[in-house]
Amino acid sequence: MAYRKRGARRETNLKQDERMQEKEDSKNINNDSPKSQLSEKVLSKKEEIITDNQEEVKISDEVKKSNKEESKQLLEVLKTKEEHQKEVQYEILQKTIPTFEPKESILKKLEDIKPEQAKKQTKLFRIFEPKQLPIYRANGERELRNRWYWKLKRDTLPDGDYDVREYFLNLYDQVLMEMPDYLLLKDMAVENKNSRDAGKVVDSETAAICDAIFQDEEPKAVRRFIAEMRQRVQADRNVVNYPSILHPIDHAFNEYFLQHQLVEPLNNVYIFNYIPERIRNDVNYILNMDRNLPSTARYIRPNLLQDRLNLHDNFESLWDTITTSNYILARSVVPDLKELVSTEAQIQKMSQDLQLEALTIQSETQFLTGINSQAANDCFKTLIAAMLSQRTMSLDFVTTNYMSLISGMWLLTVIPNDMFIRESLVACQLAIINTIVYPAFGMQRMHYRNGDPQTPFQIAEQQIQNFQVANWLHFVNYNQFRQVVIDGVLNQVLNDNIRNGHVVNQLMEALMQLSRQQFPTMPVDYKRSIQRGIFLLSNRLGQLVDLTRLLSYINETLMACITMNMQHVQTLTTEKLQLTSVTSLCMLIGNATVIPSPQTLFHYYNVNVNFHSNYNERINDAVAIITAANRLNLYQKKMKSIVEDFLKRLQIFDVARVPDDQMYRLRDRLRLLPVEIRRLDIFNLIAMNMEQIERASDKIAQGVIIAYRDMQLERDEMYGYVNIARNLDGFQQINLEELMRSGDYAQITNMLLNNQPVALVGALPFITDSSVISLIAKLDATVFAQIVKLRKVDTLKPILYKINSDSNDFYLVANYDWIPTSTTKVYKQVPQQFDFRASMHMLTSNLTFTVYSDLLAFVSADTVEPINAVAFDNMRIMNEL
């Protein structure tokens, strides 16, 4: 924000004292060179130089120094010229601190997003695996032989009330994360140890299963079959078949993955088209392609659908984060300026132009404040990165530094108004109007009303009669980005007058008109200060035209590498820009052209493509999970966590700090999107086989039987004597879902009181925070209290009765005087038995192909000599040599 210098009266007294001091200094220092005198007068007093990065302009502490310290200051002037110049340079550097601190962590997160296709698949996708389980005789003794069953590979249940449903939702999420974009069976095939002729099976897990079965007590026919297992190659068709041991559901998954691979043939035409068109057609870049691509080359087309969530619309926090990340990335690829004018030489020249040896007005010393090459480079990068990422900027300046304001006139000319936060833009424009424009024509100060829909420049345009000045104001007022769709991407493009630099001539005409005015209401010193500031800038007309052209060219070249629509919306936070750094850029820009290297462009393009593709894939995942949650009746419960997971997987967001209202708005946007067909098919596969998956789990039961009186335990071939029921014959059945939906528990109560066991049918975990009893806890407590009291409500796990603590192999059957009982039985269906021949499937894929993720690695690129680089109008970018 602009602000005026406080303590003005006090400063005028100080200035008179300082002028007297300067006269004394000039008498004492006759031996020093004129340059030394000049530098000392301009830069020795800290209180004379006001830096833009201060929030308040305070009177320097040096004013308060004692007479002793002032005499020390006089002694310092007598140092040698060389030492003194070093001090001056150091002091200048101290006065402007670059505003930007690179957040390397964000940049690393962006660059670390790699295409998922790069992950090499080493195993098939599996939910099931065969396991050996013991067999118990009728008397409870364990047999020596085992039986194989299909069990879940990862048998885990999440915490919560609807555990089983959440299990299936988590399973689906796991499938989505592991769903491969392509499968090349040759890469994962391993040797079958039991093969006669060194044959191979599809993956290491199949080999391990074959090995375990071969060593088990299996019939000779099965061993012979394993010995025959090997791959079958059809070289003429580039096809290979591998034997695999898979559960039928796993086979359906992998067969689906094989038939819906995303790989496409890769050739030079695609690589050529993959390079952004504007870079292909840019004569400054020389591109060559390696034409030796093998016929087996493949690639995975990146998913570059445009932003379906419209994050710029009502997602302020998310939009701020994404633009910040883009800003940091863009700054990292904007080239550094080269061969800037020597800071010291330029300050000396400016001092001569200002004739500061005949110093009569204090404000002119501020013209030289903070001019250094670091600030110039910082400003250059900030402007381009902000335009590329559409980050809003705010301006820091001091109203009394006329040079800053005149530089600000160039800035407002070449950068569209929308790029600045309105309060900052209004303050800067008001300072320019009241400090330079209105005083030149003798007009009264503009009293701007806060909240006025018009900006100060728009008001001034209507009041100023001078054609050139009004014409320039009109250009600035209507300077906006043009929205152009290039290669399907919305670009924010600068006005053609800015791109070719002609607008700088328009600015100079306005400045010349202002410098010729009489400033009738102002002192002569004031008029001269403004004129000298304009003179300093107008001396650099050629360099400013070149700078404007260079700024536009680099902005457009890097913009070609952006793949997401450039939406222009004001951001929550802003990038600070000091007008003294703009002065540094204007005064120090040389004639050396800098253009981004091809490697930088390709890197920027790849990072943008990878982020954009990952963004779309994560949207597809989130939409699929929302649909699955809806179908599993988990919609309300899981929704916020689904959206949080979506944001976490984008890597750049701090999810904990995103406001809830934006989370729910994001949920609503995701809910409206269609599900991608592959993800929908995968969910349907899971939904159709939920019962098989439940049966294979050791933690999921298909129901529970509860009774008023104890029921005798039954012998089970897999577990011995346990409270597990394998069928529901003879029990009254009630569906758990219906029970929870209706809330009518009278039927259960009546049956239990009549000593009729009730079977509640539905998937539930053995151990759960919300047991089946708590699901029916709304019963009349007086009737049901005794039933609840007689059982462990939170543990439904089967009870295993052992003979003694030393043996895990035998179960209690011999004590005929005591019959083990339980008031609760778990209804658990028998898992599917493992049948070797029924589980052997042949999978088919290409014999070989190579997937390339970095397509630009095939392109060798170089640039013309920077001095010969041309802009869009086929003229050299930098003409002022």
From Swiss-Prot:
Region (5-fold hub): 1-82
Positions of region (Disordered): 1-46
Pfam families per record: Rota_VP2
Transmembrane segments: none
Biased composition (Polar residues): 28-39
Annotated positions for site Interaction with the intermediate capsid protein VP6: 221, 225, 229, 840, 842
Hydrophobic as annotated region, ranges: 395-415, 423-443
Biased composition (Basic and acidic residues): 9-27
Free-text description of this protein's post-translational modifications in UniProt: Sumoylated with SUMO1 and SUMO2. Sumoylation of viral proteins seems to have a positive role on viral replication.
One term of GO molecular function: RNA binding
Domain statement: The N-terminus binds RNA. It is necessary for encapsidation of VP1 and VP3. The N-termini of 10 VP2 molecules form a cylindrical hub underneath each 5-fold axis of the inner capsid.
Protein name: Inner capsid protein VP2
Top-level taxonomy: Viruses, Riboviria, Orthornavirae, Duplornaviricota, Resentoviricetes
